[in-house]
Amino acid sequence: MGRKSSKAKEKKQKRLEERAAMDAVCAKVDAANRLGDPLEAFPVFKKYDRNGLNVSIECKRVSGLEPATVDWAFDLTKTNMQTMYEQSEWGWKDREKREEMTDDRAWYLIAWENSSVPVAFSHFRFDVECGDEVLYCYEVQLESKVRRKGLGKFLIQILQLMANSTQMKKVMLTVFKHNHGAYQFFREALQFEIDDSSPSMSGCCGEDCSYEILSRRTKFGDSHHSHAGGHCGGCCH
């Protein structure tokens, strides 16, 4: 009986430790989501005036955006990405994409030209993935006239800064394999790695999947196993 009791205590202790670790993860995500403006700590990154561009950048929850700005972001995403989606197993569905982009957890970086014309944006969230606190980048979309001028890279650098300042472990994103320009951009220019949770790494569908999950660790990230033992998903909402 003594041996069984000892094993039971060890299991209970392990469960308590795992729960405490997950509570700590969720506390960091909740703290990040309570911020008024995650970009406030980096005023120098509120402007981008290189390569012929002069734009201002703001960070807001989706609830703080004007409906016209949300409509612009959706329309730009559809223009840039609908064909890519239709070439994947996901397909393109207006309603599902709009619901994703207007979810209460959505944050936005918006780049404005002349303080009035939106020209680029990133939709991101502070969330939990596979037991880790992460900043997940859902979209980075640019109008054609501002591409290839460093603005997209600048927006991703802002995400990395905010992920570090909020103690997230990594920045994550999903990219289609057939979107060769974006894949090369993230892997080579921004040094993102294929995440352990990506289908090609996890053994789930692998070559049959049209996408990869990429990530780049922050100074708070490490190579240890996640708290969730491989289960992917959010917990803080």
Curated annotation (Swiss-Prot):
GO terms for molecular function: histone H2A acetyltransferase activity; histone H4 acetyltransferase activity; protein N-terminal-serine acetyltransferase activity. Its EC number is 2.3.1.257. Induction: Down-regulated in hepatocellular carcinoma tissues. Substrate binds at residues 85, 127-129, 138, 174, 197, 211. It catalyses: N-terminal L-seryl-[histone H4] + acetyl-CoA = N-terminal N(alpha)-acetyl-L-seryl-[histone H4] + CoA + H(+); N-terminal L-seryl-[histone H2A] + acetyl-CoA = N-terminal N(alpha)-acetyl-L-seryl-[histone H2A] + CoA + H(+). Pfam families: Acetyltransf_1 (PF00583). Widely expressed; with the highest expression level in liver and the lowest expression in brain (at protein level). Acetyl-CoA binds at residues 140-142, 148-153, 179. Keywords: Acyltransferase, Cytoplasm, Lipoprotein, Myristate, Nucleus, Transferase. It is found in: Cytoplasm; Nucleus. N-alpha-acetyltransferase that specifically mediates the acetylation of the N-terminal residues of histones H4 and H2A. In contrast to other N-alpha-acetyltransferase, has a very specific selectivity for histones H4 and H2A N-terminus and specifically recognizes the 'Ser-Gly-Arg-Gly sequence'. Acts as a negative regulator of apoptosis. May play a role in hepatic lipid metabolism. This is N-alpha-acetyltransferase 40. The gene is NAA40.
